């Protein structure tokens, strides 16, 4: 962990090491060739400048692939500030390259929780020409932390007592202290932010779940676009991305032979499907746990054994959580696992595993092996290895998803930002999805790169199906 991040005099950036910029730029150049969707959007919209002068905050993993997204947003006119959405996911050379290009970025690998939330605040803080502090007009969010901070800050300024309520979560305690500090240092700040804020596009399942929860209570402050449920995001990033990056994270962290191991994948949504198939492809024997009978049946029909976590204790070598839920692996599970077990998470937040309870366990001994790999010697003498402190193993212990699949996701994010701005006076304060026509267009932008040739419908065929020759080709309710 870099405990002394480098800061520019004008708060232009706060990163690990600006000297890494040249390395970062070389990798960004490589990634651009693997991200045809984003590069096509640049070519299409650079002259039109649909986001000209629009203040955009990003709270999303500061990786090489994200750097290509940031520069795409800038190329189409946006005024961008950025922070990572995970304390371990930043690639420091990517952050350095972006800082050198003039984009304010506040991110480094190995932030503390206090540093993480302060970086989020920095990314949300724009200064107007008259010196007034304000916020973004649009947000690119991943997990909903930037959205959460604004909502909680605004609610505090309007009488909420949430910051004074007790909390068992260490991260919640950090957020509450930050909001109390801002209330003193910047009175009325969040109200000014909300007055200018026009929309948010959300990247991941967990963040989308948060948005729907807020919207259901009538507290959503702006229109939101659910990018996660675009087919070209969830069925590609979540599935095919995890299929490659989970094993990458496990192997970089532990140099473990997966073949012959018994692995438990908790959850069989798109992320769980990709994870289970990844482990099986390496020769692991895979057990799936599920709460949903449909997903459980899917797993069984794919040949996976489906049972409970409790039934696997003392047998499994590897546990992977993928659910987006909390307390999936609890302290009573971990103390009953076999010796030398590996536990990790590829869902967005660290609360899938009871990490705080593990750290607080009486008699436990914690030994850091290397960054993002911790060895716990339990009171019963068994050893448990926890990866990335229960946060995203593919980004904490490796470099996340490959560029090509992230081009799908980030093309959706860019189109969502354009759509939110163009329709800022049309959309109500609700959660929307991008139209299927755009979803198909994102897919189309990636076909040439991998040598795909589409069949074209004849007019008679299109009429028979009741669709246009150009699409959309499937109804909204179609399940891919």
Curated annotation (Swiss-Prot):
Localization terms from the record: Cytoplasm
Major localization class: cytoplasm
CDD domains: SAHH
GO molecular function: adenosylhomocysteinase activity
Keyword Hydrolase in record: yes
Binding positions for NAD(+) per the UniProt entry: 204-206, 238, 267-272, 290, 325, 346-348, 394
Sorted UniProt keywords: Cytoplasm, Hydrolase, NAD, One-carbon metabolism
Catalytic activity: S-adenosyl-L-homocysteine + H2O = L-homocysteine + adenosine
Biological-process GO terms, alphabetical: L-homocysteine biosynthetic process; one-carbon metabolic process; S-adenosylmethionine cycle
Assigned GO CC terms: cytosol
Pathway info: Amino-acid biosynthesis; L-homocysteine biosynthesis; L-homocysteine from S-adenosyl-L-homocysteine: step 1/1
EC number(s) given by UniProt: 3.13.2.1
PROSITE patterns: ADOHCYASE_1, ADOHCYASE_2
Binding-site residues, substrate: 63, 142, 203, 233, 237
Details of cofactor binding: Binds 1 NAD(+) per subunit.
Keyword match NAD: yes
Cofactor: NAD(+)
Function, as annotated: May play a key role in the regulation of the intracellular concentration of adenosylhomocysteine.
Entry similarity comment: Belongs to the adenosylhomocysteinase family.
Protein name: Adenosylhomocysteinase
Taxonomy of the source species: Bacteria, Pseudomonadati, Pseudomonadota, Gammaproteobacteria, Lysobacterales
């Amino acid at each position: 962990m870099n405990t002394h991040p480098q800061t520019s005099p004008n708060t232009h950036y706060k990163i690990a090491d600006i000297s890494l910029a040249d390395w970062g730029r070389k990798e960004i150049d490589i990634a651009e060739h693997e991200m045809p969707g984003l590069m096509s959007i640049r070519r299409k919209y650079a002259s039109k400048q649909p986001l000209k002068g629009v203040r955009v905050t990003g709270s999303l993993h500061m990786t090489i692939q994200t750097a290509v997204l940031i520069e795409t947003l800038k190329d189409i006119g946006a005024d961008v500030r950025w922070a990572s959405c995970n304390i371990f996911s930043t690639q420091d050379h990517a952050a350095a390259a972006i800082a050198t290009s003039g984009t304010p970025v506040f991110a480094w690998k190995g932030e503390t929780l206090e540093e993480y939330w302060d970086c989020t605040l920095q990314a949300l803080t724009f200064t107007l020409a008259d010196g007034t502090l304000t916020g973004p007009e649009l947000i690119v969010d991943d997990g909903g932390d930037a959205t959460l901070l604004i909502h909680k800050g605004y609610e505090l300024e309007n009488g909420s007592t949430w910051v004074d309520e007790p909390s068992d979560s260490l991260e919640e305690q950090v957020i509450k202290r930050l909001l109390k500090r801002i209330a003193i240092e910047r009175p009325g700040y969040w109200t000014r932010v909300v007055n200018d804020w026009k929309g948010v596009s959300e990247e991941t399942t967990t963040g989308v779940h948060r948005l729907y929860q807020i919207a259901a209570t009538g507290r959503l402050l702006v229109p939101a676009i659910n990018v996660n449920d675009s087919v070209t995001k969830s069925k590609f990033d979540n599935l095919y991305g995890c299929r490659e990056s989970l094993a990458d994270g496990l192997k970089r962290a532990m140099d473990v032979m997966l073949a012959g191991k018994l692995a438990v994948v908790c959850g069989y949504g798109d992320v769980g499907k990709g994870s289970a198939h990844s482990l099986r492809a390496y020769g692991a024997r895979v057990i799936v746990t599920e709460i949903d009978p449909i997903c459980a049946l899917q797993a069984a029909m794919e040949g996976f054994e489906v049972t409970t976590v409790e039934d696997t204790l003392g047998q499994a070598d590897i546990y992977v959580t993928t659910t987006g839920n909390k307390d999936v692996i609890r302290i009573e599970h971990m103390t009953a696992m076999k010796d030398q077990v590996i536990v990790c998470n590829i869902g967005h937040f660290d609360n899938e595993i009871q990490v705080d309870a593990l750290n607080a366990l009486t008699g436990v001994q914690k030994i850091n092996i290397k960054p993002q790999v911790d060895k716990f010697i339990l009171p019963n003498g068994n050893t448990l290895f926890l990866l990335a402190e229960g946060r995203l193993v593919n980004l904490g212990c490796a470099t996340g998803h490959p560029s090509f699949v992230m081009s799908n996701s980030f093309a959706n994010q860019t189109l969502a930002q354009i759509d939110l701005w163009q329709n800022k006076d049309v959309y109500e304060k609700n959660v929307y999805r991008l139209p299927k026509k755009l979803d198909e267009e994102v897919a189309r932008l990636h076909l040439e790169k991998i040598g795909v040739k589409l069949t074209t419908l004849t007019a008679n065929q299109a009429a028979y199906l009741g669709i246009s020759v150009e699409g959309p080709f499937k109804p909204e309710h179609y399940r891919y």
